[in-house]
Amino acid sequence: MNDPNGLVFHDGLYHLYFQYNPQGSEHAHLSWGHATSTDLARWTEHEPAILWDDTEQIYSGSVVVDHGNTSGFGTAEKPPLVALYTAAADGHQAQALAYSTDGGYVWTKYRGNPVLDRGTSDFRDPKVFRYDDGGDGYWVMVAVEAEDRQVLFHRSDDLKTWTYLSSYGPAGPVGGVWECPDMFRLAIDGDEDDARWVLLISLNPGGIAGGSGTHYVVGEFDGTTFRPTAPLPTPAPELLVDRGQSRDELEAFGWIDFGPDCYAGVTFDGLAAHERTPVSYTHLRAHETKA
């Protein structure tokens, strides 16, 4: 068990999906486990949601409520839940889709998978949100090329066909691979007319305390490009290889937590903007705890 995936609040329930091996404790047969809660403290575990098969393992991703039924998998009266996840197999990673019409318990993999394939080995962890452009809006996917320390932005009208928008990075902390990005708009002191965009990036290793860590960047997003309010330095190419940044260098960047064990944190879809709620996992402790 590791990364929290597909966090979504729907019909009064918090749904937490998570990386899970239903056949053992080793890093294999990766699927999505599933639990629900009404209060974020007490959880009920359900049957695994999206299972691995002979063609793919189910890596991290996200879930959205498709209120406008833009995907066509549900109806306007009963919108589907749509999951975008990384399908991983044989050194290749691409983004795939599954959908649920029963509130998030039974999932069907889309026959047209993958929905976004760059032909690379480290393209993963899609986080999807709805962007309001003043018109009908559209979907934005934030994902990473992990080893390149780049965040890639794509857009879609129907969650099935994706178009490249822009990239961010490498910049700031690069002492480990970039994974599990998230991005959301956050009002300053509750004023929706004065808001910033926050980009979250998990690093492993390369955190400020020497282990894993979650870095944040505050900036602007115009629907195409993310621009930090205070631009971060572009690292020298050798840093992407030797992964050496000092504590003093790392203190210049934003961190969610200053311990060595905060990783893969993402926020719930379906909550009001002022209720932005993340869930992370304790990466080091997970590896030190016996199954």
Segment roles from a protein language model:
Residues 1-18:
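Beta-strand-rich domains and repeat architectures in extracellular enzymes and scaffolds
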Residues 1-6, 24-27, 41-76, 104-132, ...:
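Surface loop/turn signatures of beta-propeller and other carbohydrate-active proteins
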Residues 13-16, 73-83, 136-140, 193-198, ...:
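Entry beta-strands of beta-propeller and related beta-repeat scaffolds
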Residues 31, 92-96, 149-152, 209-216:
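Structural motif
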Residues 34-37, 97-101, 154-156, 214-223:
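Beta-propeller blade signature
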Residues 79-109:
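Carboxylate/His-rich catalytic cores and anion/metal-binding grooves
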Residues 131-181, 185-206, 223:
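Active-site neighborhood of glycoside hydrolase catalytic domains
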Residues 282-289:
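Conserved small/polar residues in nucleotide/adenosyl-binding loops
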